């Protein structure tokens, strides 16, 4: 074997290693995305002003195994009956007592601030309307209470959607990634 043949074999070997590495990295990224993250299209205005129609979010599916859900999380729920998925804000956990009075949220008789609604509540209040009607509800074991941030225009646990179980929850919002110029974490 001459030096030229050895050099060609080394180049082919390096090329093969590079191609295989690219394929393995792509497969790893695809697997991570498939198992841990899912893109989701926002349809409608039920989460306005926090999330807008046609925005795209990345949903963290791993949260189900890494620490669970917390009040205030933005979650994606899959409705088995309709086959559709919805984005809502997690308000109540299993066993919670939820009360809304004069547009103020109380959980287990403790006043809860909703900073994500502060400006929106003020706008609505100036027009002489309350954002959320008064109600009281107990969250059953194994269920969650959810509402859209656009309380005047949201199908949620108050009015027909019911209370999802943990199995119905796909994951939590981790990033608004589209439109690209408005990337952010919505909270």
Swiss-Prot record:
Cystine crosslinks? none
CDD domains tied to this protein: S26_SPase_I
Q: Which InterPro entries match?
A: LexA/Signal_pep-like_sf, Pept_S26A_signal_pept_1, Pept_S26A_signal_pept_1_CS, Pept_S26A_signal_pept_1_Lys-AS, Pept_S26A_signal_pept_1_Ser-AS, Peptidase_S26
Task: Indicate how the chain sits in the lipid bilayer.
Answer: Single-pass type II membrane protein
Cell membrane recorded as keyword: yes
Q: What keywords are annotated for this sequence in UniProt?
A: Cell membrane, Hydrolase, Membrane, Protease, Transmembrane, Transmembrane helix
This protein's record includes keyword Transmembrane helix:
yes
Instruction: Note the PROSITE patterns from the entry.
Output: SPASE_I_1 (PS00501), SPASE_I_2 (PS00760), SPASE_I_3 (PS00761)
Could you give one GO CC term from the UniProt record? plasma membrane
- The highest taxon in the source lineage is Bacteria
Segments on the Cytoplasmic side according to the record's topology features: 1-16
Q: State the similarity comment.
A: Belongs to the peptidase S26 family.
Q: Which NCBIfam families match?
A: sigpep_I_bact
What is this protein identified as?
A: Signal peptidase I U
Q: What species was this sequence derived from?
A: Bacillus subtilis (strain 168)
Q: Which gene encodes it?
A: sipU
């Amino acid at each position: 074997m001459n030096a030229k043949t050895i050099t060609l074999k080394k180049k082919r070997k390096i090329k093969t290693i590079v191609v295989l590495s690219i394929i393995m990295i792509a497969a790893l990224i695809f697997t991570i995305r498939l198992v841990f993250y899912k893109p989701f299209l926002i349809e409608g205005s039920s989460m306005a002003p926090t999330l807008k129609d046609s925005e795209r979010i990345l949903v963290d599916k791993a949260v189900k195994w890494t620490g669970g859900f917390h009040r205030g999380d933005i979650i994606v729920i899959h409705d088995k009956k309709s086959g559709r998925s919805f984005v809502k804000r997690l308000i109540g956990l299993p066993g919670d007592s939820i009360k809304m009075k004069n547009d103020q949220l109380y959980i287990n008789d403790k006043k809860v601030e909703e900073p994500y609604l502060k400006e929106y509540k003020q706008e609505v209040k100036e027009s002489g309307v309350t954002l959320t009607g008064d109600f009281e509800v107990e969250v059953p074991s194994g269920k969650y209470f959810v509402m859209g941030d656009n309380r005047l225009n949201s199908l949620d646990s108050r009015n027909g959607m019911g209370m999802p179980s943990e199995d119905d929850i796909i994951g939590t919002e981790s990033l608004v990634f589209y439109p690209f110029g408005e990337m952010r974490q919505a909270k």
